[in-house]
Curated annotation (Swiss-Prot):
It is an enzyme of class 3 (hydrolase). It comes from Acinetobacter baumannii (strain SDF). Its cofactor is Zn(2+). Homodimer. Binds 2 Zn(2+) ions per subunit. Pfam families: Amidohydro_1. SUPFAM superfamilies: Metallo-dependent hydrolases. Zn(2+) 1 binds at residues 13, 15, 99, 247. The gene is pyrC. This is Dihydroorotase.
Amino acid sequence: MNSITLLQPDDWHAHLRDGLALKRTVPDLAKQFARAICMPNLVPPVKTVEEALAYRERILAHVPEGNNFDPRMVLYFTDHTSPDEVRKIKESEHVNAIKLYPAGATTNSNNGVSDIRKVYAVIEQLEEHQVPLLLHGEVTHNHVDIFDREKRFLDEVLSPLLKQFPKLKVVLEHITTSDAAHFVLEQDRNVAATITPQHLLFNRNDMLVGGIKPYFYCLPILKRQTHQTTLLEVATSGNPKFFLGTDSAPHAQNAKENACGCAGCYSAPNAIELYAQAFDQVGKLERLEGFASHFGADFYGLPRNTSTITLVKEDNLVPESFDYLDNQKIIPLHAGKTLQWRKV
């Protein structure tokens, strides 16, 4: 297969940041996707529908002319989120979900939920109104090994949560382990998962063998190859519980190449080509459209896109860097390497 035409894909998990960063991040994402779930972990975080709509306007100001990119907004779940805010999400045309970060789990997550039992009143409303709860699925206890944090979250947080709220709509975001994949498979249709390009294409050897490579460092961290293999199997299976979410996360070069470097891979500029490469490597390119263009929209109860994109099989050199912020650079995932697919 030398070319493939898909319904325009969507990104169900992306970080755009705010302010000057939007000049870089919004056009990069808008050239790839029709819609994106825009993460709320700004400083300060996006905690109300009003704040989300204001952030959406800031994003729209940077969409290239002639592009119909539609940012879909998310609220940041805190210990102080009001149950009434859930009703406002349900009534909003542009806000689709609420994101729960365990406090301290990732970039700008210090305002996150300290104990999920404290917010059961809000979760009750999420279940009633069928508003999706998006989860960064890791525990954050210092004594838990970083490679075990996802599995511990499933056992200690998510399993009890779904027993208490069996109809809750949940997206377990950026899954990285066989444990998470099998957990999602065992649940009803109200539980789904997103998978990033880096967790399909790479594993912890890519990050750690032959020197530490900071551009593979993200959270949840890359796992061993056996987990990567399982993620590829479920992503390419045609099961609608698994769909595209890049978790594209911009950090300037000096924040990544650092004694204490930031977590996140910037995949937005070549995201769909990265996924195409992953699917093609296992001979499942025909399954890409469902994963990228159908299943996420279906889960969120939104119409599928009607426009299409075409990918052709030809060498596609990923740029070494892009301009970012004031006189800084951002290094994309797979910088300086050649992909086998190009979006035309």
